[in-house]
Amino acid sequence: DIILKVRAPEKSEFSKIKLGQHIISFIWPGQNKALLDSLKKKKVTVQAMDMIPRISRAQKMDALSSMANIAGYRAVIEAGNQFGRFFTGQITAAGKVPPAKVLVIGAGVAGLAAIGTAQSMGAIVRAFDVRPEVAEQIESMGAEFLMLDFDSDGTGEGGYAKPASKEFIKKEMELFRAQAPEIDIVITTALIPGMPAPKLWPAEMVGLMKPGSVIVDLAAEQGGNCDVTIPDKMIETKNKVKVIGYTDLPSRMATQSSNLYSTNTRHMIDDLTPEKNGVPYVNMEDDVIRGATVLHNGEITFPPPKPKIVAIAKHTNEKVKEKTPEEISKEKIEAEKKSGRLQAVLLIIGACLTWYIGMYAPAEFMQHFIVFILSCFVGYQVIWNVAHSLHTPLMAVTNAISSIIIL
């Protein structure tokens, strides 16, 4: 009654599909309209694992993220296999080996996995994404976020990117053109739902790369981000750049992929059978089920309604107005005046407190008390005048000086 698959049904399998059957698999309905029309004739209900919305409640069944995570990791492994040098820099008796420079285009799940893997292997990692809110994620993983000086936000719906304007693409190409000659490994991961993969690394960029460089195109199955990518093949260009267009990267880690995908599909079945009676119920009011359902009893329900939640962009490329020397000088004078007033108030309070204690305390106590106050003041001045950069490596010395003065 229910068929669980990885890839969409093939033509040779159509004859085996029964009327009214339930199919759960990757479908890619945006690129496979003919497939939807063929399945419609069978009056089947189809949940596309690639159409599950990117919301928190659906993470447990988000097969795209699971497979993208594996693909991003494996992309770095495949690149390292074809790359002729170390990822990390080394200084040996035979000479100095520079670290590999890796550029990751697209900082989704696959991109972040690739960044983390390359960074852990010692490479210098740079990353680019049209969505400004991912800059913090990239930098938190130790990579450099390549910022475009362009007032535009590429954030789309459901956590994906949206198509960019011609002006933005022009600026983007200028950035990549500057990066291409010095980058050793390029990993492209950019996809737009329901559309062919955007062309982000044209043949011109490939020609600018050094001999021995490697390009891994994770969007090869959807047309590729690189002009010269051939799906399912690895080619070498005239200038000795290797371009990897494998579309089965998750299958190259079959055990891990099977475990994650089976968990995703199990959670999908759990949501389809809320009564736990084994009978699937397609609740079209449920955002997750509605988003994944592309055929319902033979009726095409693709595309789903737009997601209600859109990521809030963080504009990190806003220019900060620089202060003039006059403004800086004025602020400094104001700060000194404020500090002076505060010190005067504290001295008056301290003097009053000392006088009050002296009225009732024994003479011996007052002698010790005054010495203690003076030692605190001297200690404060000594420690405060130590350069800030020395405090951390010399923390033991700093503490020792403080203790000696107090004693």
PLM regions: where:
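ADP-ribose/adenylate-binding Rossmann-like module
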Residues: 18-50, 185-236, 240-244
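Glycine-rich phosphate/diphosphate-binding loop of Rossmann-like nucleotide-binding domains
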Residues: 88-179, 332-336
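Cytoplasmic-side transmembrane-helix entry/capping segments in multi-pass membrane proteins
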Residues: 369-371, 392-403
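A structured beta-alpha segment of the ubiquitous adenosine-cofactor-binding alpha/beta core
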Residues: 1, 8-9, 156-186, 190-203, ...
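Membrane-water interface at loop-to-transmembrane-helix junctions
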Residues: 173, 326-353
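Adenosine-phosphate binding glycine-rich loop
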Residues: 50-92, 99, 220, 226-316, ...
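Structural signature of hydrophobic alpha-helical transmembrane segments
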Residues: 363-375
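Phosphate/diphosphate ligand-binding glycine-rich loop within oxidoreductases
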Residues: 2-77
